[in-house]
C-alpha cells in the first residue's frame, strides 16, 4: 500500500514556510492505519521487542496499537509535570530555548528490548531525548519506527547506530 497518498499536506502551518505533513488522514482510514500498524509490528517482532515507548502525543498514537497487537506494554514519554509518579528527566535544546521530557522511573526494566515509535522524524531531537531516557533506565533500544521521515532535515544523523524504520520518506 502506498501510504503517502493518505498523508495530507498543509502549506504554511503551523507557521509560514512550513509544509506540514498531517498523518491524521492515515489514522482516519482504517485500512491505511491498520497497514501502517502492521508494518511496524512486523519490524518489532523481528527485533523481539519487550516494550514500546513513545513521546507524546503522536508517539502514543503510533505505539499503542503496535504494543496492543503484540500483547506487550507501552510506556509514555511526556513533557515535564505530566506524569504522576517519580520520573527521570532529560533536557535538550530547541532552536529557541530548551525542552524537558520525562519518563516514569519504573517504566523500563534493565535489559528490556525497546521499540521507540513516533509519527515523524524531523530534526531528531525528541527521539534522541527519548533514547537517552530509555538507556538511562537500562533499556536496550533495538528499533525506532516512524510513519514519516523528512530526509532533508537530516534527523537520521542523530540516530546513527540504531535500526530505523520509516514507512514514508520525503526528500524535500
UniProtKB/Swiss-Prot annotation:
<dbReference type="InterPro" id="IPR029057">
    <property type="entry name" value="PRTase-like"/>
</dbReference>
<comment type="subunit">
    <text>Homodimer.</text>
</comment>
<dbReference type="GO" id="GO:0005737">
    <property type="term" value="C:cytoplasm"/>
</dbReference>
<dbReference type="Pfam" id="PF00156">
    <property type="entry name" value="Pribosyltran"/>
</dbReference>
<dbReference type="InterPro" id="IPR005764">
    <property type="entry name" value="Ade_phspho_trans"/>
</dbReference>
<dbReference type="GO" id="GO:0006166">
    <property type="term" value="P:purine ribonucleoside salvage"/>
</dbReference>
<dbReference type="GO" id="GO:0003999">
    <property type="term" value="F:adenine phosphoribosyltransferase activity"/>
</dbReference>
<keyword id="KW-0328">Glycosyltransferase</keyword>
<comment type="function">
    <text>Catalyzes a salvage reaction resulting in the formation of AMP, that is energically less costly than de novo synthesis.</text>
</comment>
<dbReference type="GO" id="GO:0002055">
    <property type="term" value="F:adenine binding"/>
</dbReference>
<protein>
    <recommendedName>
        <fullName>Adenine phosphoribosyltransferase</fullName>
        <ecNumber>2.4.2.7</ecNumber>
    </recommendedName>
</protein>
<dbReference type="InterPro" id="IPR000836">
    <property type="entry name" value="PRibTrfase_dom"/>
</dbReference>
<comment type="similarity">
    <text>Belongs to the purine/pyrimidine phosphoribosyltransferase family.</text>
</comment>
<keyword id="KW-0808">Transferase</keyword>
<dbReference type="GO" id="GO:0006168">
    <property type="term" value="P:adenine salvage"/>
</dbReference>
<comment type="pathway">
    <text>Purine metabolism; AMP biosynthesis via salvage pathway; AMP from adenine: step 1/1.</text>
</comment>
<dbReference type="GO" id="GO:0044209">
    <property type="term" value="P:AMP salvage"/>
</dbReference>
<dbReference type="GO" id="GO:0016208">
    <property type="term" value="F:AMP binding"/>
</dbReference>
<keyword id="KW-0660">Purine salvage</keyword>
<keyword id="KW-0963">Cytoplasm</keyword>
<dbReference type="InterPro" id="IPR050054">
    <property type="entry name" value="UPRTase/APRTase"/>
</dbReference>
